[in-house]
Amino acid sequence: MPETPNKVLIIGSGPIIVGQAAEFDYSGSQACKALREEGVEVVLVNSNPATIMTDPNMADRVYLEPLDARIVAKIIEEERPDGILPTLGGQTGLNIAVELDEMGVLEEYDVEVLGTSVETIVRAEDRDEFRAFMKKIGEPVCASEAVSSVEEAKEVAEEIGYPVVVRPAYTLGGTGGGIAEDEEELKRVVERGLEYSRVNQVLIEEYVGGWAEIEYEVMRDGSGNCITVCSMENVDPMGVHTGESIVVAPAQTLTEEEHQMLRSAALHIIDALGVEGGCNIQFALHRETGEYRVIEVNPRVSRSSALASKATGYPIARIAAKIAIGLRLDEIENQVTGETYAAFEPALDYVVVKIPRWPFDKFPEANRTLGTEMKSVGEVMAIGRTFEEALQKAIRSLEIGEPGLGPSPEELEADPEEIRRKIETPNDRRIFCIYAALKRGLMSVEEISELSGIDPWFVEKVKRIVEMEHEIVRRKDELLEFIRTGEADEETVEFVREVKRTGFSDEQIAELLGVDEDEIREARLGVGVEATYKLVDTCAAEFAAVSPYFYSTYEEECEALRYD
């Protein structure tokens, strides 16, 4: 291992804003702990006092200052750190590191950028450099060109053909970007994008709407060892920002050939870029032809990193921080198992679903259409043995008054054309409208998939929840008798267990049967239908777990120790 720096400056992510929620605080807190474990003095600069990372016991010294390059330069002058770690504070940290380098501050005070170098950051964040580098290493990208004016944008858009995607450089959450269907819309989006870009640059890109969006979270150390932490699949197709889409991990609809193709491409890209630490790589995949495009590379801990970390139990930010000070993947112990190392790729024997949380309840007049720019202010994550179970758990966690997946009374009575429009156009109620269409028999799985661009596999899973609801209602008399007497035959008990495995809450079942929620709970517990707990241990039970965490489900075997 190389010589460890004595003092490191970590750049925090600042306030919680649209597109940037608490995931970066989670990452920064992990990093502070990881560096102090190695005896490194940690100096933290963050403008947000309402975070975990600014707690007194997280860093040796905390500066609550605006996240501005000139202010960070003064802190560097005062503290004289050996290194700066900018990859844990989201886009803000990267932008400040690049500005400090351009100002000559890092060279003047002999401060090393730890982990991913400034050159690599620029190569991934500058739209022109990224496109040129991907072509150089033989990875396919969308036809695109970086521009700095509206007139240039018009010329490029005419050449590529409408619609086009506008992506500002050095921004987070698609801020300032969008999809332009015509010249008038292009002018509006480009003007806004240039205003938001730190370097007055936007990328005009070929639109691959309807292609599947797949992400890989990848780790690499300074010796070139690489692993994939996990794959993630957006339920919505390309055209909706990954932070605005329901995301499932691991990817559910990829063939083995597609998975290996994209995994190999992800490892090739992180190695060629020379990223040291965590990296998120986004792909667009055409199902029919098998073609793919590299959409974006985030050479930092990102929103998706926080999801991948919690989904797998693999502490990405902690390991990225240790890699930044010179440790290799095979030197960093996996704290969950206590006997494997960070070079061991996580294995998942469960399904994780992430759903964004939009503030439309606070802003009822806002435009609810979703696109390439984020509108959500947070997200929830749920774990289950099946996609259906995890999806219903996640919907309950949103705290929007829904006990699970099901349409609102308005959606049950809405005009069929209104339901079709809401399925065709991405919006926060799309998954509920798909449920309504299936429940009302308005559309088939194939029609919904064709209209929305959502893979039929996901629509089939929603259909299974609808069918389970119908079956509960069909067996209403039998279930009410069970609730009244507390007695049931084996078939009924197994049916109740299957209902719970599909993610139905006691409240949902009670609403369908017209009884009290407590009656459902009492009856099922009386016949042994109770939650069991399964491990999130990074290795699918291949090794014993020292410090795992658990998720609840309704299988026979419980992996948690019971204390009666």
Swiss-Prot record:
GO biological process: one example: glutamine metabolic process
Q: Which UniProt keywords apply?
A: Amino-acid biosynthesis, Arginine biosynthesis, ATP-binding, Ligase, Magnesium, Manganese, Metal-binding, Nucleotide-binding, Pyrimidine biosynthesis, Repeat
So, what pathway does this thing act in?
Answer: Amino-acid biosynthesis; L-arginine biosynthesis; carbamoyl phosphate from bicarbonate: step 1/1; Pyrimidine metabolism; UMP biosynthesis via de novo pathway; (S)-dihydroorotate from bicarbonate: step 1/3
Assigned EC number: 6.3.4.16, 6.3.5.5
Question: Quick one: which residues bind ATP?
Answer: 127, 167, 173-174, 206, 208, 213, 239-241, 282, 296
Note down the stretches annotated as region Carboxyphosphate synthetic domain. 1-399
Q: Which NCBIfam families match?
A: PRK05294.1, PRK12815.1
Molecular function GO terms recorded: ATP binding; carbamoyl-phosphate synthase (ammonia) activity; carbamoyl-phosphate synthase (glutamine-hydrolyzing) activity; metal ion binding
Q: What is this protein called?
A: Carbamoyl phosphate synthase large chain, N-terminal section
Tell me its family. Belongs to the CarB family.
Record text about domains: Corresponds to the N-terminal section.
Q: At which positions is Mn(2+) 1 bound?
A: 282, 296
Which InterPro entries does the entry link to?
ATP-grasp, CarbamoylP_synth_lsu_oligo, CarbamoylP_synth_lsu_oligo_sf, CbamoylP_synth_lsu-like_ATP-bd, CbamoylP_synth_lsu_CPSase_dom, PreATP-grasp_dom_sf
Which residues are recorded as binding Mg(2+) 2?
296, 298
Cofactor(s) required, per the database record: Mg(2+); Mn(2+)
Function (record text): Large subunit of the glutamine-dependent carbamoyl phosphate synthetase (CPSase). CPSase catalyzes the formation of carbamoyl phosphate from the ammonia moiety of glutamine, carbonate, and phosphate donated by ATP, constituting the first step of 2 biosynthetic pathways, one leading to arginine and/or urea and the other to pyrimidine nucleotides.
- Entry's transmembrane regions: none
Query: Domain ATP-grasp spans what residues?
Result: 131-325
- Residue positions annotated to bind Mn(2+) 2 are 296, 298
EC top class, as a word: ligase
The cellular component terms of Gene Ontology attached to this UniProt record, alphabetical and capped at eight, are: cytoplasm
Annotated stretches, region: Oligomerization domain? 400-560
Subunit composition?
Composed of two chains; the small (or glutamine) chain promotes the hydrolysis of glutamine to ammonia, which is used by the large (or ammonia) chain to synthesize carbamoyl phosphate. Tetramer of heterodimers (alpha,beta)4.
Residues the entry annotates as binding Mg(2+) 1? 282, 296
Q: How is the cofactor bound?
A: Binds 2 Mg(2+) or Mn(2+) ions per subunit.
